[in-house]
Each structure stands twice: as C-alpha cells, then as structure tokens.
Amino acid sequence: MPQSATKPFIDVLSGQRQAIPPMWMMRQAGRYLPEYREVRAKAGGFLDLCFNPELAAEVTLQPIRRFGFDAAIIFSDILVIPYALGRSVRFEVGEGPRLEPLDDPAKVATLAPRADFGKLAPVFDALKIVRGALDPKTALIGFCGAPWTVATYMVAGHGTPDQAPARMMAYRHPDAFAKIIDVLVDNSIEYLLAQLAAGANALQIFDTWAGVLPPAEFARWSVEPTRRIVEGVRAKVPDAKIIGFPRGAGAQLPGYVEATGVNGVSIDWTAEPAFIRERVQSRVAVQGNLDPLVLITGGAALDRAVDNVLANFAQGRFIFNLGHGIQPETPIAHVEQMLKRVRG
C-alpha cells in the first residue's frame, strides 16, 4: 500500500482534523459529467466499462481533473463479486441490475465458495493506472458492498424498495442465508486486500440497505459481517483505513462503529447532528452528509445546506461528502458552487 502521510483524506482517517475538510462525492464518476457519458457510450454495457482498465481508469480520473477532489474512488460496482462467483449479473438500461435469484436453500447449495479473481483483474489493473496518474496528495479509494446489501440483490435477483425477499429468507432459512453471507465475507476480504495491493489507500464498505433491518438483524447481518471483513483485512494490512457506510442506521451507528472497528463512518442526510457529534465523531471520522437533492437545487438553498453541514461537523475529524450518490441530473455548476463554499 503506497505511503499516504501527505494525503488530507487519509490524515482525517488517521485521527487528524483538517482546517479545510477533504472532500469527494459518492458516484463522482457518473452521468452528470458529459465526459463520462462519452466514455460510457464508447464502452458499450455498464460491466464492459467496469472491466475495461483504461476506460475505468479514465472515468475514475475525470472528476479529479475537473474538480480537484481529495480522493478518487475506483469506478466499479458492488455486484462484481457475485459476477466473479459465477452468478449471472447484467445491467438493463433503466432497470438496474438483474441477477439469477438465490431464493431457496437448494439454489444456495449451488453457490461457489470462492470467486474467480481472474475475472476481477481488470479492476486491479485500473487501480494501478489511476494510482500512477494521481497526484501524491490525492487518495485512492477501493470498495466493496457489505455482505447484507450484496445478498439482497443476490436473493431477489434485483433491487426492491424494502428488501423483503432477503429479509424473509433470513427469517425462513437463516442457515442458507448465513452461507451466502459467509461466502461474501470471505471473498470481500480477498477482494479488498487485492485492491490495497493494487494501489488503493483506503477502503469503503457500502451497506446501502442496512437501514431496513431491525436491531437484532442489523447486528447479525450488517454489523457482524462487516466486523469480520475489517478484521480479515487488518490481519494482513494492520494499518488499513476503512470507512463503513451503513445507510439509514441512525441510532445504531455508535454500536456499529464500536463493533466493526472502522476508521470512519459515512452518514446520510437524515442523521441527527448533535447525536453524531457526541456518539460517533468523538470516536471516529465522520463523512457526509449533504442531501443530493439540495445539490441539484443549487442557489441559496445549497449555500445554506453546505454551511449547515460544516457548522455541524467541521470542528472534528470530518470528510465532506454527500449523504448518498450524486444524481445524474445535477448541474456541474452546483458542484463547483459546493466546492467553493467548502474550500472558502
């Protein structure tokens, strides 16, 4: 893993507050950028772009060139692990991902225990290209989906509003569901370690659907698998910097931070600021949490919202980000407005 002492983003995750918070945006390589749309059209399908090292590196670097963010995040997807496990994964235009559902114990019995990491070599090649092209002060983030969130897609075969198929399977067939989680934990550890070896300076674990789980299930299916991943990565890379993003976890965030051992936690725009300052930011770095819709809105509403986020969190260890991914219809001028406001 490259040295990172001069990177403001890594410094915050190491416990050092920065006078001007480092910043990046979830989904910063995306459809709001005309240069991204051009490369995406050239690539063909979404997975074709993910698995073309030169093009994936190019779209990873585009927002860094345009905005000078403090961190790049490799262009990929949380569903590349199911793909490498031999599951059918495809992305339909306007519909999102489609997978072959693992919706009963007999189907789960067919799940391969180990991914074919040769299928993911293009991701590691893209990381190497990006790391070589980045300024030494700019961090490079690798990532994976948390086992719970990846499992929700694997069980249902597609995204659902409340993740009912995965929740029902975890209640009805907990042993079979635990097998899916165990396979994802083991392969996520290996995948994240390979990303560090390829040049990533930090890692983020995206648990987009953590917030749909009741407390006992949140502990079992979100917290514990994430803890095992963090422990597994740190067994090989003790100083690995890891951010967790259990979206919608709310009052369960302090327990998540304590149990998982993450260096930082990403929060969505619904998080209560005083609670986060006292119970979370007092222990780890906080990343977030501008509402992506106010970034679309722009104007005085955006200025007020940015000022509010800074007033809430910038006195502690803080990374400025959105509370979730940037929306495709976001005007570039509003991203520039946000940048100027944060950086003064």
From Swiss-Prot:
It is an enzyme of class 4 (lyase). GO terms for cellular component: cytosol. The keyword Endoplasmic reticulum does not apply. Substrate binds at residues 27-31, 46, 77, 153, 208, 324. Keywords: Cytoplasm, Decarboxylase, Lyase, Porphyrin biosynthesis. Transmembrane segments: none annotated. Its main location: cytoplasm. SUPFAM superfamilies: UROD/MetE-like. Pfam families: URO-D. It is found in: Cytoplasm. Pathway: Porphyrin-containing compound metabolism; protoporphyrin-IX biosynthesis; coproporphyrinogen-III from 5-aminolevulinate: step 4/4. PROSITE patterns: UROD_1, UROD_2. One of its GO terms (biological process) is heme biosynthetic process. One of its GO terms (molecular function) is uroporphyrinogen decarboxylase activity. It catalyses: uroporphyrinogen III + 4 H(+) = coproporphyrinogen III + 4 CO2. The record marks 77 as: Transition state stabilizer. Belongs to the uroporphyrinogen decarboxylase family. Homodimer. Catalyzes the decarboxylation of four acetate groups of uroporphyrinogen-III to yield coproporphyrinogen-III. This is Uroporphyrinogen decarboxylase. It comes from Bradyrhizobium diazoefficiens (strain JCM 10833 / BCRC 13528 / IAM 13628 / NBRC 14792 / USDA 110). The lineage of its organism: Bacteria, Pseudomonadati, Pseudomonadota, Alphaproteobacteria, Hyphomicrobiales.
